[in-house]
Regions:
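Short alpha-helical DNA-recognition segment
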Residues: 29-47
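Short, basic-rich loop-to-helix N-cap that marks the start of a DNA-contacting helix
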Residues: 52-65
């Protein structure tokens, strides 16, 4: 008997979204380059965030420190509709 896949095709898959981060930057009238400078992160990390790719938790913490916010203010887990 074959085991069923842990990720059945009918199940919803989840992914990280950084939309909240971009909305927060707009609210604070900051540009991505300003965030990179203030949080001391690279433009490559900003680009990864823009593509909703995984980044090191240290980067997320630096962003939160720079923006004086919580991790839940800059990211969320959403259903992957792709």
């Amino acid at each position: 008997m074959l085991k069923e896949s842990m990720f059945d095709k009918t199940e919803a898959h989840m992914k990280i979204s950084y939309k909240k981060l971009w909305k927060l930057l707009i609210d604070k009238e900051m540009m991505k380059k300003d965030l990179a400078e203030k949080a001391n992160i690279s433009s490559a990390s900003i680009a990864k965030l823009g593509r909703n790719e995984n980044v090191n938790t240290d980067i997320l913490l630096r962003i939160c420190e720079a923006l004086e916010c919580d991790v839940s203010d800059i990211m969320e887990v959403v259903e992957d509709t792709d």
